[in-house]
Amino acid sequence: MPALILPLIEAAGHWPARGSLLGLDLGTKTIGVAVSDPDRRLATGIETVARKAFTADAQRLLALAAGRNACGFVLGLPLNMDGSEGPRVQSTRAFARNFARLTELPIGLWDERLSTAAVERELIANDVSRAKRAKIIDEHAAIYILQGALDRLATLNRAD
């Protein structure tokens, strides 16, 4: 059975109470990957996957998830500033649909507006060279996306 693809809050209801989540930042050339601790408090970068073909990319992501006993994925959804969906969102949703056929782990979609821009500003503020930024930007964006999702989930859990 294919994985569920839901907004983050709805997906959280399908994940066990504990277990790592993998955060993904889909770029056109690379996929940034981050992982949470099992208690879902802190996101840490794993790697930047150079995109090749969908099947190869998906197999790498599934191997990373299995190696960290992940129970779900958080996929950054690049909405436009006004909240509308453009071509990048359509591409992300298509990736999610295809990826869901290969796993049963629920996929949560999380608004990632300005994540790459925020990370870029932070790296520049820390005097990271342009060449180094290009190599790590997607992984850091995945950390930013996953940490934002973890923080939102923690807020919901406190409200319960």
From Swiss-Prot:
Superkingdom of this protein's organism: Bacteria
Cellular component aspect of the GO annotation: cytosol
CDD domains: YqgF
Keyword ATP-binding listed: no
Pfam families: RuvX (PF03652)
Main location (coarse class): cytoplasm
The entry's keywords: Cytoplasm, Hydrolase, Nuclease, Ribosome biogenesis
Annotated compartments: Cytoplasm
Protein name as it appears in the record: Putative pre-16S rRNA nuclease
Annotated source species: Rhodopseudomonas palustris (strain HaA2)
Lineage, broadest ranks: Bacteria, Pseudomonadati, Pseudomonadota, Alphaproteobacteria, Hyphomicrobiales
